[in-house]
Amino acid sequence: MSEPSAEGQQTILVVDDEAEVRALVREVLVMHGYNVIDTGDPFEARRIVEAQPIHLLLTDVVMPIMNGLELAKRIEAISPTTKVVLMSGYSTAAVKGSGRPMISKPFKANDLVSTIRQMLDSKSAFRRPGPPPAPKPGFGPL
């Protein structure tokens, strides 16, 4: 695991059970000025998010302890402003149906950085589709 962020830098938490993937992602993102914290343990990821601000969670989908979709839900529950990007070597219906941005493994460094930048520059975090708002009283069909 790396050190906490320097003031002014955006912090990205990378969660992947493969140390080689974490090392590669770290190298690419640090070269582009991001502060990177990484772990192979989704439960440690949760503790990290509870302890400090994380701007973006980059998580593998297929992991032995907890899948990335479940981790994303748990992180969003405790830190709604943390943005999420999924990584996967598989493009399953569940991943596609999640509505979250996904980086396919193996990935190109430029694609990784572009996706991360786009998410961090966006104005809002991922929002699961919910029911439409209730109509206001007195404003029914005319």
Model-assigned labels for residue ranges:
Residues 40-44, 67-71:
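Acidic catalytic/metal-coordinating carboxylates
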Residues 33-40, 48:
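Short hydrophobic/Thr-rich beta-strand motif most characteristic of the beta2 strand and flanking loop
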Residues 63:
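Receiver (REC) domain active-site loop signature in two-component systems and cognate sites
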Residues 105:
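A Lys-centered signature of the CheY-like receiver
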Residues 60:
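Active-site residues of response regulator receiver
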Residues 1-13, 26, 73, 81, ...:
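Non-catalytic signal-transmission and effector/linker regions of two-component phosphorelay proteins
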Residues 23-31:
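Charged docking surfaces used in two-component/phosphorelay signaling
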